[in-house]
């Protein structure tokens, strides 16, 4: 039952993405090894408890390994998931990574240089 509740939460967020973003469709496959997005709920990783591979990087992961981990998503309660909840945001965040989106501060075209900001702040304080 816990696993099914988790799956329903993820499916709810996937449905929201499909409704809001033209051209995006998540397809369920019959065999786990055929899936590009493979979600675990307890996979230890240096990335932390909740993480996802970004974009096509998932295609380079062994087919028996997860490409996303959602340890923070519980399945103890039934009744789905509410938009705006912490779990909803967490699932959305990781699914968007799966679709190829990076954090804004990691984008190569960002309008600022993080190392320069640190240097300027340090120089200014002196």
Language-model segment annotations:
Residues 1-126:
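Zinc-dependent metalloendopeptidases
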